[in-house]
Amino acid sequence: MLRRQNNFGQKLLVEVKMYGKEPSNMANIVADKFKELGIEKDCMVVSFDLKLMEEVKKILPELKTGYIMPLLLGDLPDTNVDFYALEDFSYNEKIAIQAKIKKKKLLIWTVNDIIKIRKYLRQPVDGIITDELEELKEEKKYLKENNTYFDKYIRIITNI
């Protein structure tokens, strides 16, 4: 599956799920697997475990690493990863500005509703994590093809 990821025309985001009984060298295992498959420059890896992602980043700097935050109250934490994956409910423009200041990418997850997909395509975010890749691609294409000031005005007044 990981070797076929380019067939989707989209970067693959791999989530490492921790359960508490992982070996102490888990960061090495993750980094080694990406190197073994030769996909460290083509994929991104993310986890709820910030320490793991920071260790992977030290071992394999070219691999884009991220920290999943299911709920954020307050400011973005300082991290040594490339991006934050923020749950849709916690998003606001203040957080987007903080991410830019910290020079980190901001991805929003899991956005499967077309209304929310449209919303986030118009927000200052760097990516949308979705199970509805075709809908996302179609909406991006539509926005690119219908991008005059009049089109934008109509979308604002109709809220679509």
Which ranges hold each PLM region?
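Short loop-to-alpha-helix "cap/lid" segments that border enzyme active sites
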Residues: 3-160
